[in-house]
């Protein structure tokens, strides 16, 4: 650019490029990176200040993935049908109130905690209700069932102590749901930046003014 002696650019030095000026301004700013603890229902679109570590396993117990019947796989007849008496019921939030023994079946619903067995041997398989017949309070089970079918294991999705969300990320609805699933009620986020713009001059007016 040619500098004339009678124009406003005639300061006798090198002109600063706009991008260089912006970079110099940004480098001179002292931005305070403050954090705050907020509830999950206020966390959408906020920036996470620290990693989120799972406080508990997901699922928190062995549970059923379907509506059906909890059994011990080793009770099944490999070549023919098996009949087992139904001795109780387990629902989500209402686990079986007794021990499930070998040779027994328990009516179980999706999300219900798997019953406990005797001598540290727990039932390990869930039959879908569509795959069995019910006769005289007994389930008739066809051959061909796989061990461990339709059972979700403790910590199968998330193991307690693992990092599930990384600091610096912008929180989406699914991230907040994940934090809730792992036991978090509050999240540490960056406080929003506060920026002020000053306009000066006698010619400055509010929008709509003449």
PLM ranges: what are they?
Residues 2-13, 70-210:
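Short, glycine/charged-enriched hinge/interface segments at domain edges or termini
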Residues 1-83:
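Short, low-complexity N-terminal leaders and the immediately following helix N-cap/first helix
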């Amino acid at each position: 650019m040619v500098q004339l002696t009678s124009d406003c650019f005639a300061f006798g030095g090198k002109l600063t490029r706009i991008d260089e000026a912006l970079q110099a301004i940004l480098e001179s700013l002292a931005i305070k990176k403050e954090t705050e603890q907020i509830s999950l229902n206020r966390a959408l679109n906020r920036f996470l200040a620290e990693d989120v570590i799972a406080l508990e396993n997901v699922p928190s117990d062995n549970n059923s993935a379907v509506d059906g019947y909890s059994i011990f796989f080793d009770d099944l007849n490999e070549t023919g049908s098996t009949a087992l008496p139904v001795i109780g019921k387990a629902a989500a939030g209402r686990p079986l109130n007794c021990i499930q023994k070998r040779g027994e079946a328990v009516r179980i619903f999706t999300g219900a905690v798997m019953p406990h067995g005797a001598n540290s041997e727990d039932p390990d398989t869930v039959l879908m209700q569509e795959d069995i017949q019910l006769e005289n309070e007994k389930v008739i089970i066809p051959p061909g069932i796989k061990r461990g079918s339709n059972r979700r294991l403790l910590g199968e999705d998330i193991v307690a102590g693992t990092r599930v969300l990384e600091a610096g990320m912008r929180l989406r609805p699914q991230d907040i749901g994940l934090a809730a699933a792992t036991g978090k009620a509050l999240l540490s986020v960056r406080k929003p930046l506060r920026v002020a713009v000053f306009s000066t001059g006698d010619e400055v007016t509010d929008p709509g003014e003449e």
